[in-house]
From Swiss-Prot:
HAMAP family: MenD (MF_01659). The lineage of its organism: Bacteria, Bacillati, Cyanobacteriota, Cyanophyceae, Synechococcales. It comes from Synechococcus sp. (strain JA-2-3B'a(2-13)). It comes from the Bacteria. CDD domains: TPP_PYR_MenD, TPP_SHCHC_synthase. The keyword Magnesium applies. It catalyses: isochorismate + 2-oxoglutarate + H(+) = 5-enolpyruvoyl-6-hydroxy-2-succinyl-cyclohex-3-ene-1-carboxylate + CO2. Binds 1 thiamine pyrophosphate per subunit. One of its GO terms (biological process) is phylloquinone biosynthetic process. This is 2-succinyl-5-enolpyruvyl-6-hydroxy-3-cyclohexene-1-carboxylate synthase.
Length: 608
């Protein structure tokens, strides 16, 4: 759709310069493809808020808490894969966007942050609600600028339009991420006529002005159309392929991934694996585990396999897709063995925290496999060793989960993979849930779509991000798997529960504190001495009645007592609304159970 045939009624608001500026911004964003925006309340941002709220093609969602608003926008960006404008007033409001903006930068999601500001003459003079907002977010944005003050100049209108076009494009290219525009306004902030646009009366009276003015504004080229022209399999890369084909002790590492087309991604990895005859060690946050039948060399229990030294399974070469998997045992093995690493990742970041001998190949795996041979490689002893170990440990793990009747945090992840409806969007919180998914999530063919915040790996903003995913995928019910601390840390997100268009079921594992610390050395050391610090400073149990907290926000809450009751609660998932299903677990007992099982399973033989 082009600017010429994008026919709309007149959109510009000429009552004053600020309304003109705001309406021009909203109309430009609309023509670029914007359909959702997130707005936190405030006076200085009124011209932006009013314009976005009034635009018929943009759903402007009001969110009181700026931190929650920013993570909600991040969830919308993850689900829609489109830039989401995020608006706040001047002062400290924009600082609350920072955690989500960092996550967007680190994980590669497009946000267009619009911080309203006082004009320059009211800064650095204690005018109130004013801080230095220029380059507020340091080096994290893909691009950042301060807009000029609104002025009655035709060239200024063109400047604003093109700056917005550039800002929108920079949220997407060359790699998705946040962009920050600082937007100053003088009074009047309300949409009242003051005659300030009189010098532009000739434009206002021209019936063709808007059509002519916006004729070049249209959604930018999609990422897929840009990638289609890239052909990595050239002469200089054929040598890489020949080196891989000559190696019988290679592995493919598939880290966390949220590809636009999961099946295409999985098929590309399977093509690469079968052509090389290499096992694929797939992170629980990778779509590979949810399309298991497409990849015959899939390994899901590698963390348990590598908890014991098995030199016969150590790789000489590694193809790493994106970031490393979460597994600590895998990272320790790679650090010890120091294999030759080839990292396939279109992003330019340094993705090798182990500092192994690594070559960065700046391509997506879907691009790379387009030119490789179709003929599968033979099965090697090395590959068979991995497949045998996987089969043995997976069988023991699955049997243990099947036989277990009481609550266990790890079984929740395993159970969801067997019971969630196909293609369910599942947001997985950081800390213990993401590790239980890594350890226990089985291979399946349910095409479940994992969502997560693994850019900075924090527990902040989990609920709000999941609500954003649910709002963006409103035609398909969404599930959030979270612990009690992550839930409480972002409890202000509960206020969004009445606004979400769609469905979110929050599966809340309440183990009265930070269960992840029970698995770390601090759990043993921190319980020693006359005044042990572990419980108050690390486990940090919270005495909050979660049912009453949900009730205060109008969110239905239910404590689930059995696996059968959980199955009934999830079949079917509701089509609308937010609800909490709480499961009470014992973090100390569950931590010990993990340790016992991990020791038992990791000692299983793995000889081919």
């Amino acid at each position: 759709m082009t600017g010429e045939n994008f026919v709309l009624p007149r959109r510009l608001d000429w009552r004053n310069l600020n309304t003109l500026w705001g309406s021009l911004l909203a109309e430009t964003l609309s023509r670029l493809g914007c359909r959702l925006a997130v707005v936190s309340p405030g006076s200085r941002s009124a011209p932006l808020t009013y314009a976005l709220a009034q635009h018929p093609n943009i759903e402007a969602i009001p969110v009181l808490d700026e931190r929650s608003a920013a993570f909600f926008a991040l969830g919308l960006a993850q689900q829609t894969r489109q830039p989401i404008p995020l608006v706040c007033t001047s002062g400290s409001a924009g600082a609350h966007f920072f955690p989500a903006l960092i996550e967007a930068a680190e994980s590669g999601w497009p946000l267009l942050v619009l911080t309203a500001d006082r004009p320059p003459e009211l800064r650095h003079c204690r005018a109130g609600q004013a801080i230095d907002q220029v380059k507020l977010y340091g080096h994290y944005p893909n691009w950042q600028a301060e807009l000029a003050l609104p002025s009655a100049d035709p060239e200024a209108l063109a400047y604003l339009r093109q700056t917005l076009v550039h800002a929108w494009e920079r949220t997407l290219y060359p790699f998705p991420g946040p962009v920050h525009l600082n937007v100053p306004f003088r009074d009047p902030l309300a949409p009242i006529a003051d005659g300030s646009t009189a010098p532009l009366l000739h434009l206002q009276e021209d019936p063709e002005f808007e059509k002519t003015f916006f004729r070049g504004v249209a959604p930018p080229c999609t990422g897929s159309s840009l990638q289609a022209v890239r052909s990595p399999f050239q002469t200089e890369t054929v040598s890489f392929w020949q080196e891989w084909r000559g190696c019988e002790r290679g592995v493919i590492l598939a880290g966390p991934a949220q590809p636009a087309d999961p099946q295409r991604y999985v098929e590309a990895v399977a093509h690469l694996a079968t052509a090389l005859g290499w096992p694929v060690l797939a992170e629980g946050l990778s779509p590979l585990r949810n399309y298991a039948s497409l990849n015959p060399y899939l390994i899901t229990t590698y963390d348990l396999i590598l908890q014991r030294d098995r030199p016969q399974l150590w790789p000489e070469q590694v193809i790493q897709l994106g970031s490393l998997p979460t597994s600590k045992a895998l990272r320790q093995t790679l650090a010890k063995v120091a294999p030759r690493v080839w990292r396939l990742d279109p992003r330019p970041d340094n993705g090798d925290p182990l500092h192994n001998p690594t070559t960065h190949l700046p391509f997506a795996v879907e691009e790379w496999v387009a030119g490789i041979p179709e003929a599968p490689a033979k099965r090697t002893t090395f590959l068979q060793g991995w497949l045998t170990a996987e089969a043995q440990i997976r069988a023991a793990l699955d049997q243990a989960m099947t036989d277990l009747s009481e609550w266990f945090e790890g079984k929740v992840a395993w159970w969801l993979a067997h019971h969630l409806p196909p293609e369910t969007p599942l947001f997985i919180a950081n800390s213990t849930p993401v590790r239980d998914v890594e350890w226990f999530w089985p291979p399946n063919d349910r095409r479940i779509r994992p969502y997560f915040n693994r850019g900075t790996n924090g527990i902040d903003g989990i609920l709000s991000t999941a609500l954003g995913v649910a709002h963006g995928s409103h035609k398909r019910p969404t599930v959030l798997l979270t612990g009690d601390l992550a839930f409480l840390h972002d409890s202000s997100g509960l206020r969004l529960g009445q606004q979400v268009r769609g469905s979110l079921t929050i599966l809340l594992i309440n183990n009265q504190g930070g269960g992840i610390f029970e698995l770390l050395p601090i759990a043993e050391v921190g319980r020693q001495g006359p005044d042990p610090p572990f419980e108050p400073y690390f486990a940090t149990p919270q005495l909050v009645d979660l049912a009453l907290l949900c009730q205060a926000h109008g969110i239905p809450h239910r404590r689930v007592e059995s696996w059968q009751e959980l199955a009934q609660a999830l079949d079917p998932l509701p089509a609308q609304g937010v609800r909490v299903l709480e499961i009470l677990t014992d973090r100390k007992a569950d931590a010990q159970r993990r340790r016992d099982w991990f020791q038992q399973w990791s000692e299983l033989p793995s000889k081919p």
